[in-house]
């Protein structure tokens, strides 16, 4: 009986040791926090108000920073990366404010999506890519 318990404990220990490098690699992510250019649709202290604004603009997200909720319609490392999204918002008569803000984001995905956004002129593709950028790239999104 003691021999079986010892074998089981050894197997668990070996498994744990072998799993540590894999776990530490998965914990490393490509998140960065730095100044980004954003198209802000509103800033709210109340989540319900921010949710209402988000619902009025397809593809927008709510970004929480401490106790403040930002409704964002676009994000890019470069100001020129927002040009196509700005055109769409203007065409739809949606008010926005362009500014810089510090955002926690997934650096790997942001580069990929910004390149795709720059290469397309199709409005539906631009809206879809922008929505993916906001949802997959921006951390702290609600």
Sequence positions of predicted segments:
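Acidic/polar low-complexity segments and flexible, solvent-exposed patches
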Residues: 1-142
């Amino acid at each position: 009986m003691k021999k079986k318990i010892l074998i089981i404990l050894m197997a668990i220990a070996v498994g744990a040791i072998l799993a540590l490098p894999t776990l530490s690699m998965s914990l490393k992510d490509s998140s960065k926090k730095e100044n980004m250019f954003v198209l802000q649709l509103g800033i709210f202290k109340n989540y319900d108000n921010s949710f209402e604004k988000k619902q009025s603009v397809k593809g927008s997200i709510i970004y929480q920073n401490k106790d403040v909720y930002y409704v964002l319609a676009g994000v890019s490392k470069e100001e020129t990366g927002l040009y196509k999204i700005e055109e769409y918002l203007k065409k739809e008569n949606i008010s926005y404010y362009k500014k810089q803000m510090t955002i926690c984001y997934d650096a790997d995905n942001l580069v990929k999506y910004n390149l795709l956004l720059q290469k397309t002129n199709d409005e539906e593709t631009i809206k879809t890519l922008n929505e993916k950028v906001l949802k997959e790239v921006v951390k702290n999104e609600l």
